[in-house]
């Protein structure tokens, strides 16, 4: 019934198995990949005919994790998987980015790649396996895919690279780098690092590239057994259209792309396009070519002119040379009620970034396959349509926004203080208010400033820069701080973030079939120069975290109580802790080890809550003086609440230093008094005294009398 084919290799000390022919046989390509005991299924289906009216590759990639893969049942009312999680979205992008540039340019058929995690062994993250499985499924499917690709994760610890570190090993590594590419070149890099230098980062990329070659060979071996016949793709010759178009549009396009202001340049390019379309499609005449073909050629001509200008003259669209960074303006404290805020402007790219500090109640609970965990640092990136002068629909967070937000998160995360030193939940929101290239790196710079403005003690300020590439044969130019047009019309988007000490995040996407180690080395070196320059500009606004938290930020005090007192502080059904929160207005969080965190933006509220909790969790000391409130008056004395919820008796003989006939002659309910703890009787009842304390000053009269008596004795002895 089944015609199965499989290959198996040892990879990084664990078996990797690729199998096809048993599951999902109606898909164009289907591969079950197993690494350790982590299993994923990758499927590829492509439409039989091209999609009409599109000038792009209609590729969709969806990665999904099933709760059953980890032996769990989903939470929530419906008990089934819902919309994609952040992890699923990020892995979908991770698969998409290296495979997209490898499709034949003319391919316009709807193509869908779906990767499903079927089993997770809690050791091997499914993301790398998902990339490998998708590559194998595409290679078998018959779609015009110029792969296969391989992928690997690289860690770095004890001055050594680690291939595909396990989840446990990842907790101790200085690097989390994912690299993908072909047998010849690197196509994609995604990473987070603890301020590593350029040589270590480049070494990690090349280490990963070398070590996924056996995976590529295994996919080729499987394809030789089971691949379908390649589909035919109609390659259309547009050279005649391009020749005509050059004659009527080249000079106008060169002039348009010499205009430095984005909106003016776009208007000029649109005018040239209108002229070209009018030439090729005159009114009342039968056109020689399809409109879509002419529009495609115009787009290609735009790219060629920009690229020729840069390679021939070394000058870019806005007049800069290849290394110059646009003008930068940094401002902090721009929003009066925010805990921390910054406005970062670089040329025509601008980000308004806001930091908010919260407590343990604000931590995000993330339900992952490996288990539920809490996240205390959140970074959200928003890209509204007005940032590029367009209208658009506002709705749910888009994949791009999630991806850019995570990139900035990775850049900032390594320089945050440990949670035990700074016990806040921190949320950073970046509102991209203008965009002309590199808005994610503007988010990194703005986030660093906003965090320092809020008083978050970062290890060092962090900045980011986006690099581009123009590659024609053996000629190339690496561009610092790319514009949006240079991103769209160039061959590479290479983003580097870090501090003066090293790189914290590196992301690379290649639109051609890979770049060489030499080009990456040049790009990393040039990026460091740009990053140091940007950090210098940022230092004009703020050089380090403010000494104090923002005026409206909550303050958090942390202390410990005995674990056997936790129940008393919480109370039956949470009654006591609710009362503390309601009456003081402070937030209280108690952990299982007795750690108590009290948070409030009101200092008095915090003091009151701390005092209340400590009074419950500790015992009063004999001989100490306490403030108290008379809660009940009896014939034999008064009961006084003096230590949290603890009451004690002031016997009638201890009310005053004279004979008292009636308790009410001295006190009544509600009176504020000062009492001294005398001790406890045989039944454990608390004995208090008012007469031992000066009710005005709170001075201990018994101690005063003893001191005076002790001071007189030597004088008497001397007199004798």
Swiss-Prot record:
A biological-process GO annotation: RNA processing
Domain S1 motif: 623-691
Pfam families the UniProt entry points to: KH_1 (PF00013), PNPase (PF03726), RNase_PH (PF01138), RNase_PH_C (PF03725), S1 (PF00575)
Cross-referenced InterPro entries: ExoRNase_PH_dom1 (IPR001247), ExoRNase_PH_dom2 (IPR015847), ExoRNase_PH_dom2_sf (IPR036345), KH_dom (IPR004087), KH_dom_type_1 (IPR004088), KH_dom_type_1_sf (IPR036612), NA-bd_OB-fold (IPR012340), PNPase (IPR012162)
Name assigned to this protein: Polyribonucleotide nucleotidyltransferase
Swiss-Prot/TrEMBL catalytic activity: RNA(n+1) + phosphate = RNA(n) + a ribonucleoside 5'-diphosphate
UniProt GO cellular component terms: cytosol
Keywords per UniProt: Cytoplasm, Magnesium, Metal-binding, Nucleotidyltransferase, RNA-binding, Transferase
Major localization class: cytoplasm
Classification lineage: Bacteria, Pseudomonadati, Pseudomonadota, Alphaproteobacteria, Hyphomicrobiales
KH domain span: 554-613
